[in-house]
Amino acid sequence: QSALTQPPSASGSLGQSVTISCTGTSSDVGGYNYVSWYQQHAGKAPKVIIYEVNKRPSGVPDRFSGSKSGNTASLTVSGLQAEDEADYYCSSYEGSDNFVFGTGTKVTVLGQPKANPTVTLFPPSSEELQANKATLVCLISDFYPGAVTVAWKADGSPVKAGVETTKPSKQSNNKYAASSYLSLTPEQWKSHRSYSCQVTHEGSTVEKTVAPTECS
C-alpha cells in the first residue's frame, strides 16, 4: 500500500487550465472507479471536489473535472481563478475497506493582479505601558505579490533596534499578510514626537504614523 504518485507542483495562468495526474496500480486506481480528489487551502481542512472519478459534490463549480485512463486518474481545473491556488490530493479505494492517498500537488496560479497593502499602526496599550513595556504593531494585509519591506522611523529618523517583521503568509483570499513589531521602553516611546511604519510593496510606499501625545 504505497502512496499514489502525483507531480509535486503544477502551475497555470489566470483563465488557463491545469491538469494533475494521479498514478497507481491495477489494484487501486485501475481496479475501482472510486477515485476522489481533495482541495486544501493553507491552514484549512481538505474539501472533496471530485468523487467516483468524475462526479462533483453540489457547490463545486464545473471548472473542476475528473477522468481516468488505466491506472492513472486526472483532475483538470479549467478557467483558473486566484482561489484555485491550493494543494490537491487524490485517493483511491484499494479493496478490503482500505483507501490509499496521493502524495499531493501544489497548484500555483500565475499572473494574479497586483494588490497594494492595507497598513494599520497600533500604539502601545496603556496596560503595556503600566507594565513598563511599549510595543508598536504594524499590521500589513491584502497585498499581492507576497513580498514587502518594512522600515521604522522615530521623528523621521530610521530605527533598526528592536524591530521584528514576520514572513508574509497567505490569507484565505489568496493575498498576503504580515506584521512588524517595534519594541521600545516607555521612556523611548514618550521621548519622540512620532513613530512611523513605512511599508514598501512593488515600488510603492505606504506610511502610517502614531504620536505619543494622542495616547495617554
Curated annotation (Swiss-Prot):
Nucleotidyltransferase is among the record's keywords: no
Transmembrane segments: none
PTM sites of type Pyrrolidone carboxylic acid: Q1
Chief subcellular location: secreted
A GO term from the CC aspect: extracellular region
Intracellular or extracellular location(s): Secreted; Cell membrane
Disulfide bond annotation, renumbered to this chain: C22-C90, C138-C197
GO biological processes: adaptive immune response
Keywords associated with the record: Adaptive immunity, Cell membrane, Disulfide bond, Immunity, Immunoglobulin, Immunoglobulin domain, Membrane, Pyrrolidone carboxylic acid, Secreted
Subunit structure comment from the entry: Immunoglobulins are composed of two identical heavy chains and two identical light chains; disulfide-linked.
Residue ranges of the region described as Variable (V) domain, involved in antigen recognition: 1-111
Protein role: Immunoglobulins, also known as antibodies, are membrane-bound or secreted glycoproteins produced by B lymphocytes. In the recognition phase of humoral immunity, the membrane-bound immunoglobulins serve as receptors which, upon binding of a specific antigen, trigger the clonal expansion and differentiation of B lymphocytes into immunoglobulins-secreting plasma cells. Secreted immunoglobulins mediate the effector phase of humoral immunity, which results in the elimination of bound antigens.
Protein known as: Immunoglobulin lambda-1 light chain
Region named Constant (C) domain: 112-216
Organism in which the protein naturally occurs: Homo sapiens (Human)
Domain Ig-like: from-to ranges: 1-108, 117-211
